[in-house]
Amino acid sequence: MVRYRLFGFAFGLSQLLFLVLLPLWLRLLSYLNPVVLAVVWMCLTVFVVFVVYYLCKETVNMPKRVIKILLSSYSVGLLILLFFRPMHQVYNQINYIPFKTILAFLSGNGNMLVAFYNIAANILLFIPYGVAALMFYRNPSKWQLGIVPVVIILLIETTQYLTKRGTMDIDDLILNLLGIWIGYLLYPVIQKVVRVK
């Protein structure tokens, strides 16, 4: 009974936070696919529930199958964000210079919400993949942890560029990899709450 109350509290808190920040999320719609609301909702809900459980030193047993379903749903949402953007945007640029785009965003000359979203989202949205890699592979090799993510992200960047659904940017690769590596570092913390069955 206590666990249900704790989950109810955590879930309610996450929904309240989502609603309070809804004006901010709605501003992203002019720049991104409307599915961004579902992705943000899912991320915020999971994050808040996790933090509440962690602070209360509670654990949750989760079948690997459920985690795979959640990760698959998340991945579909992320692919929609990456490849189905508003039609008025033009993408035909390539950036091979590390940190050029990041520094341009940090300069403060453009839209600060877009700048923050681009940097933060490129990191945060890839953290679950770092966690999942360690969750699903017991003893991953350096190849699996280092090279495979680089190849996958480069494939995404190339496909975005060729289909004119995004720019090909070395900074996206850097930020996405940073997100995955943060996921690796966070995995021991995640294990304290989520027990995979």
Labelled PLM ranges:
Residues 1-164, 170, 185-197:
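Bulky hydrophobic segments
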